[in-house]
Amino acid sequence: MDGNDNSANRIRWNELPDVVRAEIEHRSGARVRAATTQPGGFSHGLAARLELSDGRDVFVKAIDSDDSLAAMYRTELETAARLPSTAPAPALRFSLDTPGWLVAIFDYVPGHHPRLDRPAELAAVLSTIEQLAATLTPSPLPDLPTIAQDYGPQLQGWRRFAEHQPPADLDDWSRRNLDKLAELESTWTDHAAGETLLHTDLRPDNMLLRPDGAIAVLDWAWPCRGAAWIDLVALSPAIAAHGIDTDRLLATHPVTSDIDPVAVSAFLCALAGYWAAKSREPAPPRSPSLRRYQARSARVTTDWLGRRLRW
């Protein structure tokens, strides 16, 4: 569930048009000596480390402007350009909106995706989430939509199951409690309001643990405004997958320690329903592992929810 082994079939550096590669080199001020595609993630866009002829390294992301994910990439570029320098995120050096392609060049961050089953690496992630809440409250992007506006229509998986024929392979506990799950799911937006800039897609493959022990948070493609605790709770199923007492973690972490447990359960319920529904859709052609990831996420979150609710 960490996402580290979830790799889409990414565009490669040599698949970019010659004119786009030439413009990247021109703006970078040096020729590209080598390009290494980065593993992990579910987007099929280009994501690569570029080794430049003057000894510098940069990180490039690019996608065809007619691609179905182009709007997501554009949001990421716009968000990265407006993040404060104190945010634990790679700096955007420049972006290009050339005919046919969206391109972003970031500072290259050495490191590896954190392992949530390693106490020191998990501690670094948890410290970074506390830093995000402190640095990004109030939101430096006050014009963003709220999490209820962005995610309210999406996080209704249990309701859809309840209103239609539930899937034949739905687990017994979810089937037995479907109406109650749909009711609890419907309340999550009541608790989620806030003025923190949220990432909303924190996974280990969207973070890098640097050699100095600090975490860099990547891929700000789904930002919105909401309660500061949302990002930690959304990451918690990936932590729970390693057998860690996540209820205790939430009860002691500064971002979540004073949050009503009902609010946490409602949001977990909404996440579980979303993943349960999405995992049953056809897989995107260039991201074959996405539905498996969502199925695992649904299973872990539903199991945890059952223990929390004691239904």
Predicted regions and their residues:
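Juxta-kinase regulatory segment immediately upstream of eukaryotic protein kinase catalytic domains
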Residues: 1-35
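A cross-family kinase active-site recognition segment
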Residues: 2, 112-175, 193-195, 224-225
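Active-site acidic catalytic loop and adjacent metal/ATP-binding pocket
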Residues: 39-52, 59-60, 183-230
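Short acidic/glycine-enriched loop/turn segments that link adjacent beta-strands
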Residues: 41-44, 98-102
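A conserved alpha-helical element in kinase catalytic cores
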Residues: 57-99, 115-131
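Active-site activation/catalytic loop segments of kinase-like enzymes and analogous catalytic loops
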Residues: 229-258, 268-286
